[in-house]
A protein has these predicted regions:
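Membrane-interface alpha helices of multi-pass inner-membrane proteins
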Residues: 148, 160-175, 213-219, 300
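Active-site lumenal/periplasmic loops and adjacent helix-entry segments of GT-C-fold
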Residues: 5-141, 148, 176
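Periplasmic/ER-lumenal interhelical loops and adjacent helix-loop junctions
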Residues: 206-210, 214-283, 393-407
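Membrane-interface helix-loop-helix junctions at transmembrane boundaries of multi-pass membrane enzymes
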Residues: 108, 197-210, 278-302, 351-352
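Active-site-proximal, structured, solvent-exposed surfaces of multi-pass membrane proteins
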Residues: 414-483
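Membrane-interface helix-loop junctions at the exits of transmembrane helices
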Residues: 6-14, 35-43, 109-128, 220-239, ...
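Membrane-interface transmembrane helices that cradle and orient dolichyl/undecaprenyl
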Residues: 145-159
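Perimembrane helix-loop-helix junctions
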Residues: 181-216
Length: 483
């Protein structure tokens, strides 16, 4: 399995000097560089145009931290990122095999499930086109959360602790993925109450176990949510851009065409997803209730990514936080891989035939992956947000153009955008360009002839920020200036 995951990784990242892609890769490179000094403080001034972005307060990083370790070792952002993606793919295929075996009860089916899940179109898009590495990590954790929730609710296993640990890992990975997973677990809980047929004893057990899991999750994730909420309580924080859900949802036809072409520049389920929607229809009559629910979940999670669902009805609800309905395809990856694994189990019986089928499936996945990569190389250069990450432009992308430059910035600071961009200092009422020196966890401005005047620095101020004048701590007044 590790070899298969390695071949999958090498196929897309063959050059350790250059990455040609799009999406959020510059943002995540800046995160790696910024996190390299996390033990000196949560703010790093060498990234995000030296503004002192508080991204680490609002964007969890625990599961992304191995990339930082690789950066410490290699001192190369590109190499550290490629190594991390390789590690992520290996961990994904191994974990999916482990939990697939727990759920499917057959080694061959678990093997197929882990391969399908790793190679799935939408997961590949998340990693190699969108460069949405946090969401890709979340796709590794979500099946674990769902398994323990299922085991606790339907198999009546005492899984409160592993459910809390896996949910905590998800929170430490990506908040929006956590939000969607909470909804999914909520639907499982609702189904559990329906199945229990209002039996009081079972309902009480379920409530107690879930309460334990929730309580432990809150405690385990306090390291992330406490500083974040303190920042929000102190001042207004600029949120990432909001979107119109109906507009961002996919056309059904575009989704199908993009999937059949396994086109990574579209946000679709890919060819494996198409097979997961069609192939199970030939086995549907032989499915048991659980298998039918999984198949219907695969279909529904795909439909929810399209304009088939009236997303405009949810625009003014908390659901709008997901920004893009096609993010729900992360669950289609899980349900689609599971139902195809059940199809494999039902269509394969003889031991010799199993080996042949598994070998053929793996070779086909590798061949399709190679063809997809070749097609992507031609299409990505035509994308509006295409960029080439190499040593020549790393500083420019991680410092000046990382993406999300003003995400999570204090709202009050946005009125000074022009002066921020020019790194101007206000002395009294006049703005001036002053020399400054940037270090990992601090920035030093040299300001002359300012005695008795208020100074406004082009730096974001968060709860916990310390300002010093000539080595002495000074009061920060109204979050904009230093006395």
């Amino acid at each position: 399995l590790a070899i298969i995951a390695g071949l999958y990784s090498i196929n897309y990242f063959r050059n350790v000097h250059t990455i040609s892609t799009s999406g959020d890769i510059a943002f995540h490179f800046a995160r790696v560089k910024g996190l390299s000094s996390i033990f000196s403080g949560p703010i790093n001034f060498t990234t995000f145009n030296h503004y002192g972005s508080g991204v680490n307060y609002f964007y969890p990083y625990l599961t992304f931290f191995p990339a930082v370790i690789f950066y410490w070792i290699s001192n190369n952002l590109i190499v550290s990122y490629i190594l991390y993606v390789w590690l992520l793919n290996v961990c994904t295929i191994m974990l999916m095999f482990h939990y697939g075996l727990k759920f499917l009860k057959r080694i061959d089916a678990a093997f197929i499930f882990s391969c399908l899940y790793t190679f799935y179109g939408y997961r590949t898009i998340d990693i190699y086109h969108r460069s949405a590495i946090a969401e890709a990590i979340a796709l590794t954790v979500i099946p674990i959360v769902m398994y323990y929730a299922y085991a606790l609710i339907y198999e009546k296993k005492p899984c409160a602790i592993p459910l809390a640990v896996s949910m905590s890992l998800l929170i430490y990975t990506h908040v929006l993925s956590t939000f969607m997973s909470v909804i999914a677990v909520g639907l499982l809980v609702l189904g559990g109450f329906v199945v229990s047929e209002t039996r009081k004893k079972e309902s009480i057990r379920l409530i107690v176990e879930l309460s334990k899991a929730v309580g432990m999750t809150i405690l385990l994730t306090a390291y992330f949510w406490y500083p974040m909420f303190r920042q929000i309580m102190v001042q207004s924080i600029n949120e990432p851009d909001k979107t119109t859900l109906q507009h961002q949802a996919l056309n059904v036809s575009d989704s199908l065409i993009g999937a059949m072409n396994n086109d990574l520049t579209t946000f679709t389920v890919g060819i494996i997803g198409i097979i997961s929607l069609i192939c199970p229809l030939f086995f549907f009559k032989g499915f048991n209730r659980k298998e039918k629910v999984i198949y219907l979940s695969a279909v529904v999670s795909w439909l929810l990514s399209t304009k088939f669902f009236p997303w405009s009805l949810l625009q003014n609800t908390p659901i709008q936080m997901i920004q893009f309905p096609w993010r729900i395809l992360g669950f289609q990856v899980l349900f689609g891989s599971l139902i195809l694994s059940f199809v494999f189990m039902k269509s394969t019986s003889a031991k010799q035939r199993k080996v042949v089928n598994i070998t053929a499936i793996v070779l086909l996945l590798l061949a399709v992956s190679a063809a997809t990569k070749a097609n992507y190389e031609h299409k990505v250069v035509t994308q509006r947000d295409h960029l080439v990450m190499n040593q020549e432009n790393l500083i420019r992308y991680t410092t000046l153009l990382p993406g999300g430059l003003y995400d999570y910035a204090p709202t009050e600071a946005l009125q000074y955008k022009e002066h921020l961009q020019n790194h101007e200092v206000r002395i009294g009422k006049e703005w001036h360009t002053m020399p400054y020196q940037v270090m990992d966890s601090k920035i030093v401005y040299t300001v002359h002839e300012s005695k008795g005047q208020k100074i406004t620095l082009p730096v974001f101020d968060y709860w916990g920020t310390v300002a010093k004048v000539n080595g002495q701590k000074r009061e920060i007044d109204n979050r904009t200036s230093v006395d």
